[in-house]
Amino acid sequence: MPAQAYAGKECVCQLRKGICDQSCVRDMLSTPLYIACLRLTGRECLVVGGGDVGLEKVEGLLACDGAVTLVSPDAVPELEAYAREGSIRWERREFADSDLDGKFLAIAATSMTDVNISVYEGAERRAMLCNVVDVPPLCNFILPAIVRTGPLAIAISTAGASPALAKRMKREIAETYGEPYARLAVALNDARGWAKATLPTYRDRKEFFEGIVNGDPDPVELIRAGREDDVRALIEAAKESHPAPAAS
């Protein structure tokens, strides 16, 4: 049995008995995570729980254009407003297993252990992505703290060990990496079309972009100094030093 599935079953057994010795949580810290970014545009996402935590999860999904269904007998005012304006679909009732049908992922954000377990077990039967807030063994994906600036996104994860530590790291990383890096990412993206059309191999394109990013002068420092025109000039100079191969 996979480590994740075993840890989840063990955690369910402990929770149903009203105990949790945290051994299953400790086991999860040794489980390697496959880091990925999901495109949620138009995908059906389920959030169970209408409190402040549910609000946080709903807003995260909406920010990525997910199609969100909320299931909860009641909800905080902000979630009620999202439902009124049509940003989310709100099923004002208790969770039912059928709520998982057709969903891409599910997030359980309730204070009721039985409900959270039901969401987890139903998602497991359907081989769905599932996150039960603050119960890492009942998650087959976790939600890292995210630093977002323009196209730049940096994820910070402690594998569920300490969300508070991840949030502190988020603040510190945002202070170090942020707007200058995001603006450089935009400038480099503008050159991607030229690179794909002109440079025939992945190695050529890798060398082109790494030469700019790691070059002298440092493009990030130029942006910090307000010299974005100089960054564009660097990119143009790099293009000239990487001419298209002659036709055979």
What positions do the PLM features span?
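ADP-ribose/adenylate-binding Rossmann-like module
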Residues: L105-S111, N116-L143
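E1/E1-like adenylate-forming module used to activate ubiquitin-like modifiers
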Residues: V132-A182
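Structural motif
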Residues: E44, F104-L105
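Short loop/edge segments at beta-strand edges and connector loops
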Residues: S72, W90-E94, D134
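Glycine-rich, highly charged phosphate/nucleotide-binding loops
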Residues: A81-D101
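Hydrophobic, well-ordered beta-alpha structural blocks that scaffold small-molecule cofactor pockets
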Residues: C11-C13, K17-Y82
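Residue-level detector of alpha-helix initiation sites
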Residues: D52-V53, T113-D114, G160
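An accessory alpha-helical subdomain
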Residues: G160-S248
